[in-house]
Amino acid sequence: MMLDAIRWDTDLIRRYDLAGPRYTSYPTAVQFDGQVGTFDLFHALRDSRKALRPLSLYVHVPFCANICYYCACNKVITKDRGRALPYLQRLEQEIQLIACHLDPAQKVEQLHFGGGTPTFLSHDELRQLMAQLRKSFNLLDDDSGDYGIEIDPREADWSTMGLLRELGFNRVSIGLQDLDPAVQRAVNRLQSLEETRAVIDAARTLQFRSINIDLIYGLPRQTPENFARTVDEVINLQPDRLSVFNYAHLPERFMPQRRINSDELPTPAQKLEMLQSTIEQLTQAGYRYIGMDHFALPDDELAIAQEESILQRNFQGYTTHGHCDLIGLGVSAISQIGDLYCQNSSDLNQYQNTLASAQLATSRGLLCNADDRLRRAVIQQLICNFSLEFAEIEHAFNIDFQGYFGELWPQLQGMAEDGLIELDNERITVLPAGRLLVRSVCMVFDAYLEQHNRQRFSRVI
């Protein structure tokens, strides 16, 4: 059986609603609190240094010149390019403060610039930021690392792409969302297919290793027909990876979303139709379903890692670098170092002012206990490999699986009867009909979801 086999079952999807955590971490960021601070971070960095663990760096650039109404990211909308300078000064301080607690022998296997719009920065600013990172951390200079950056095609031309390649980036992620002009107007992101194609042509010519495109379904004025056209156009661009996100309309939490007319949003039935059609189109075009909104061509390293059962998941999404300690730099950035999760202040002024006084801007986080570590491993296995061998967990954590999770058995048996999973005394296998619903299976093992929440998340009969 092909690993990417997934079966569409509308009845199951309606019963096991898709709402729930995306499990880029366990425990999820909802559990972070202010008890965790810089002292914990220094402690974790010391452990990382002693173990000489490899690193994955995430750098957050919060600025955007224009607002996209659907966006739920931490961002600052400004046309004033001068806003970047004071931020970069503080970011450089943070880089220095963190790096002095680590060993130069710790290789940076993965680097990702996200935002906001990283290409909001001028060429000189990008050069200087990368120079600071190279000075402070052990960046690989043989192009063997996974060094990626998020690109807004409206902000990037050939010279920008050339600069990024020269600075060591070898992966790009392109926000596209939808190509239909009516949808683009409704979300205030006007971006032509030509602009996107130009960036992709540049990336290919400059030998970037991997191109990812992001799409969103469920946006205002989208219909199954016009979204299918967007997907066809995107398939023609042949990205190595695709992310197809479900738009979550939460105007009470995200101010820009209040400018979206909720009457123009597609119905839940239309959204399901879009997702089903997208999966069919991408599968026919040779893409593998990796899980949780992600697709990749079979020769992409995510697909290969999944075949070899070494895929992992962290705040950067699916990754082949889950063994690295993740260091988040910049406003709102999250780090995962050993058993510590910690997040910088999400308020730009607070972030800048704290660093101005030579203090790190850690504002909240969480230290995993033994139960968290065990459940984290279970959820990782399910969400990355669609299977879980009890013996592996028993061996790693010195427990009896069925004894430890006995109270969950009735729920798991219910899922087995419904055809989401196969369950026996040795393993859980997520079946093709359950793969789109893998987060519902993970939620069974989430100790932080209240019982009533769990019901609300899973079954919407």
Placement of each model-derived feature along the sequence:
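C-terminal scaffold of the Radical SAM
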Residues: 47, 77-100, 107-402, 456, ...
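Short, amphipathic alpha-helical interaction segments positioned at domain boundaries
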Residues: 435-461
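A short, conserved structural fragment
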Residues: 416-426
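Canonical Radical SAM [4Fe-4S] cluster-binding loop centered on the CxxxCxxC motif
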Residues: 53-88, 181
